[in-house]
Amino acid sequence: DGAAAVIICKEALAKSFRPDPVRVKGIGLSVTSGEPYLKPSFAYTGFPATAQAAQSAYEQAGVTAKDIDLVECHDCFTITEILNYEDLGLCEKGEGWR
């Protein structure tokens, strides 16, 4: 499959690796019990926790999805990655495949 890693550290240490380190301006976390996914009405067309976490991170950072240049998105299945693009607000619902 693949792998990704991020080193999070103080700015002074980051600058010892490169002169222009990336700064984290916002983070978001949202979890569900899994219960919503058991409801017959759940359509499996997105992940509400992803949308909630994205909104929280965007608000903290003072940005919108349109300001994002790069996303490292977990893709355990192709459809999961596509739905995450939509839930992150990177595209309209139903347009993630583009």
Segments from the language model and where they lie:
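Weak global preference for isoleucine
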Residues: 7-8, 27, 68, 79-82
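Generic secondary-structure signature for well-ordered alpha-helical cores
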Residues: 12-15, 29, 59-63, 86, ...
